[in-house]
């Protein structure tokens, strides 16, 4: 049994290691990385233009920043800018492409290094929509500086605030004694047993038995409950029902998640269920539906807001126009008192009307929530959240409900040593270990063909997850196997046409599975030999396997041909191509965009990393594992949770591309290869 305080003290040390490591990485990155690499990493916009400015409903001075002309190879880059992220503006001595530009770490007043000049102020992202970003500014002078700048850009800044908030939350939990926070700390550590209410179970005919059990367990729990939702088991449906039922007993609940996207998803489902939601912070997807329940939109839609806006404007005008010796302090003070009075009244009404307050875990430290306490906190996607972030929200609640799957994507951690020593262990995992009676596993999945699901169920969930009859035998083509493994190195007689970009016919070279014949496409590598060995790309040793990528593309094209173009488009079958390696996904995405044979299907083909597909599903999934070497090195493919996510995105067809000789050194991949071979022989 763990001592709860000692555990959290150790956790704080690990968080400090992560903080130090990430801050140093940011410093090195800023000093040594050129603009193009920053852009391709998704951490920089350049060039940009400062557009219109205004005061938003929170009385923050903001400016719209628009991304100007960018190169073709930048079109598919997924940027990392989102609400709440700190950013720093810079200008360059010469336009992009005319100088070799390295960075300069922004400290103090506009340091200059190798053509970079950083502005001395930092800003925060308010929201992002396509090529337009709205960021806060400290003053109108900052705007003038930006408008006068040439070759303007901005990049992500080190996120000091989030770390400070997590440290503060951990300190509160560590020092908690003889209060509710102290009780929860001891319960999570297994030092106290969680209590339950007793009342007759409620029937939910529209849920399955384990979903119904999970909702009842949430209602019975006095302290903590975990809803463990494997892929396709309806975790979100169950969680929404649990929140809805809880609101029959409580006035208001707090709903949090690690990411803005996850908060958006659960918020949207609750709104669809008729629940009044107040979203603190701006959504990751900017549309009218998502914005309609944000605090900022509701605030500025309030009938008293025009008066508040007018008072704020008057105060600014008085300050700007006053002359030396003018005594306007009393007038400004009276106006500020009236503005505060209106603002507090609007706040009170917005919170009174909301049944659910939704925000990220870090966002729960927002000053709007300072005086608010909640009977129940729901944390969605809890297995992706660092435990220190969870404590930020836990401080505001009397009981905690966590939902997620610790066999899927883990939290993102930069410091390997901190991860190895335990920072990667989530609060959800701790509770599952220390309080197994407070965990309900959802056991029926509604997504995958049974053959796709079964290996995942056996390896990750002790065989407890089963397929609903409605999906058990779903398939794209009759009499085909739903799961397939293709190894390019087993294709021993590549045609000379591979070197020139041609294709060989199915008769010349095929990989057979049942009656599904898959031709091998062009390698496009320009090498003298058709080589499926992985290659290193870039300063971070990103990995790419172009021959395997070409095999993926030709396999997909052949499979679409077997289905038939008319049927494929009429039924809107969708395809996901997944690779754990970002460079591989970029190459695949570029090829699909360039090649005419994919033009009719581009709208239904998605290419992304495993992280980019979390929570999604497709009819057809192709996975490119990339790794192929003589040493059996597989890198982070050994994090099996990522492979679990990748495989379980498929509804009807799963095709895995990988070098068996490299991968079968690992027990998981050896078993998976054997499983696929066994199905092939049936």
Language model features: what each stretch is:
Residues 227, 255:
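Hydrophobic anchor at the beta1->P-loop junction of P-loop NTPases
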Residues 1-82:
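A helicase ATPase "motif cassette" and its flanking acidic/Ser/Thr-rich regulatory loops
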Residues 249-251, 259, 348, 362-493, ...:
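Conserved helicase motor core of SF1/SF2 NTP-dependent helicases
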Residues 203-223, 238, 359, 544:
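N-terminal pre-P-loop "Q-motif" helix
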Residues 2-10, 75-217, 272, 289-313:
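Pre-ATPase regulatory/linker segments immediately N-terminal to the P-loop/RecA-like helicase/translocase core
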Residues 94-116, 492-530:
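Intrinsic disorder/low-complexity segments
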Residues 236-244:
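Motif I (Walker A/P-loop) of helicase-class P-loop NTPases
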Residues 198-199, 244, 252, 264-371, ...:
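Conserved P-loop NTPase motor core of helicases/translocases
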């Amino acid at each position: 049994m763990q001592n709860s305080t000692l555990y959290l003290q150790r956790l704080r040390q690990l968080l400090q290691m992560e903080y130090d490591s990430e801050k140093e990485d940011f410093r090195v990155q800023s000093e040594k990385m050129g603009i193009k690499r920053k852009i391709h990493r998704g951490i920089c916009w350049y060039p940009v233009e400062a557009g219109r400015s205004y005061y938003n409903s929170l009385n923050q001075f903001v400016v719209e920043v628009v991304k100007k002309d960018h190169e073709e190879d930048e079109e598919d880059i997924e940027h990392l800018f989102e609400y709440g992220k700190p950013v720093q503006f810079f200008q360059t001595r010469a336009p992009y492409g005319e100088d070799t530009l390295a960075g300069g770490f922004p400290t103090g007043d506009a340091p200059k290094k190798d053509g970079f000049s950083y502005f001395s102020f930092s800003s925060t992202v308010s929201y992002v929509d396509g090529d337009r970003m709205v960021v806060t500014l400290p003053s109108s002078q900052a705007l003038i500086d930006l408008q006068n700048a040439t070759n303007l850009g901005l990049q992500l800044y080190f996120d000091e605030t989030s770390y400070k908030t997590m440290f503060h939350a951990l300190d509160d939990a560590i020092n908690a004694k003889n209060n509710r926070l102290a009780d929860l700390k001891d319960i999570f550590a297994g030092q106290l047993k969680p209590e339950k209410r007793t009342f007759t179970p409620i029937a939910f005919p529209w849920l399955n038995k384990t979903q119904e059990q999970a909702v009842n367990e949430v209602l019975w729990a006095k302290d903590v409950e975990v809803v463990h939702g494997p892929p396709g088991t309806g975790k979100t449906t169950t969680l929404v029902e649990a929140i809805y039922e809880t609101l029959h007993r409580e006035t208001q609940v707090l709903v949090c998640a690690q990411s803005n996207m996850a908060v958006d998803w659960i918020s949207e489902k609750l709104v669809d269920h008729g629940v009044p939601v107040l979203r603190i912070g701006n959504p990751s997807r900017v549309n009218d539906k998502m914005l309609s329940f944000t605090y900022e939109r509701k605030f500025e839609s309030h009938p008293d807001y025009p008066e508040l806006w007018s008072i704020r404007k008057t105060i600014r005008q008085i300050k700007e126009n006053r002359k030396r010796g003018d005594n306007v302090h009393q007038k400004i003070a009276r106006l500020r008192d009236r503005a505060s009075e209106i603002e507090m009244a609007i706040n009170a009404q917005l919170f009174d009307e909301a049944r659910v307050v939704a925000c990220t875990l870090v966002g729960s430290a927002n000053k709007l929530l300072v005086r608010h306490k909640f009977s129940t906190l729901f944390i969605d996607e809890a297995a992706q959240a660092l435990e220190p972030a969870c404590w930020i929200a836990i401080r505001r609640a009397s009981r905690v409900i966590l939902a997620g799957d610790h066999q899927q994507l883990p939290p993102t951690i930069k410091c390997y040593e901190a991860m190895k020593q335990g920072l990667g262990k989530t609060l959800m995992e701790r509770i599952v270990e220390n309080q197994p009676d407070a965990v309900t596993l959802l056991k029926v999945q509604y997504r995958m063909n049974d053959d796709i699901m079964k290996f995942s169920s056996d390896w990750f969930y002790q065989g407890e997850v089963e397929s609903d009859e409605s999906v058990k035998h779903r398939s794209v083509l009759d009499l085909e196997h739903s799961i397939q493994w293709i190894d390019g190195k087993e294709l021993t007689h590549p045609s000379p046409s591979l070197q020139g970009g041609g294709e060989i016919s199915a008769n010349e070279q095929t990989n057979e599975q049942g009656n599904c014949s898959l031709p091998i496409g062009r390698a496009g590598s320009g090498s003298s030999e058709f080589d499926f060995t992985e290659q290193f790309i870039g300063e971070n040793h990103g990995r790419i396997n172009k021959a395997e990528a070409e095999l993926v593309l030709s396999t997909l094209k052949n499979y679409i041909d077997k289905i038939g173009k008319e049927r494929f488009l009429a039924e809107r079958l969708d395809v996901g191509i997944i690779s754990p390696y970002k460079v591989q996904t970029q190459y695949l995405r570029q090829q699909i965009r360039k090649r005419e044979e994919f033009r009719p299907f581009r709208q239904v083909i998605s290419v992304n990393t495993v992280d980019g597909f979390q929570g999604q599903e497709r009819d057809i999934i192709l996975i490119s594992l990339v790794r192929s070497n003589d040493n059996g090195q597989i890198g982070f493919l050994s994090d099996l949770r990522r492979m679990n996510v990748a495989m379980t995105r498929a509804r009807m067809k799963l095709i895995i591309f990988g070098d068996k000789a490299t991968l079968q050194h690992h027990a998981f991949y050896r078993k998976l290869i054997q499983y696929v071979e066994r199905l092939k022989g049936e």
